A protein has these predicted regions:
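Short, flexible micro-motifs
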Residues: 11, 33-34, 57, 88
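Short pre-catalytic strand/loop immediately N-terminal to key active-site residues, enriched for Gly-Thr
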Residues: 20-30
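Positively charged, low-complexity intrinsically disordered leader regions
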Residues: 1-19
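Conserved N-terminal subdomain of the carbohydrate kinase-like
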Residues: 46-89
Length: 89
């Protein structure tokens, strides 16, 4: 089995929800290195993601989502008092 480690930053993505008024957003997460890790895992590669996140609820949700996609999270560092990056589209 192919083993891959992807290193990078994943960020929270806010996107205005279609068909809604201003101020309503859907939340996701993404980034080129995470997307690569997810697609490699879907193809059957043993994939780990190496990054740093905070110790907040959003970071917890990110890790749960990655694990659900089959991406290894054992190498994710947790930084007390920090938050993940955020961007809007």
């Amino acid at each position: 089995m192919t083993r891959v480690a992807c290193i990078g930053e994943c960020m929270i993505e806010l996107k205005q929800a279609q068909g809604t008024g201003a101020g309503l957003f859907s939340r996701g997460y993404g980034g080129d290195t995470l997307n690569t890790a997810v697609y490699l895992a879907r193809l059957g590669a043993s994939t780990d993601y190496i990054t740093a996140l905070g110790d907040d609820t959003l970071s917890d949700e990110m890790i749960v989502g990655w694990a659900a996609e089959g991406v290894g999270t054992a190498r994710v560092s947790r930084l007390p008092g920090k938050l993940p990056g955020l961007y809007m589209i």
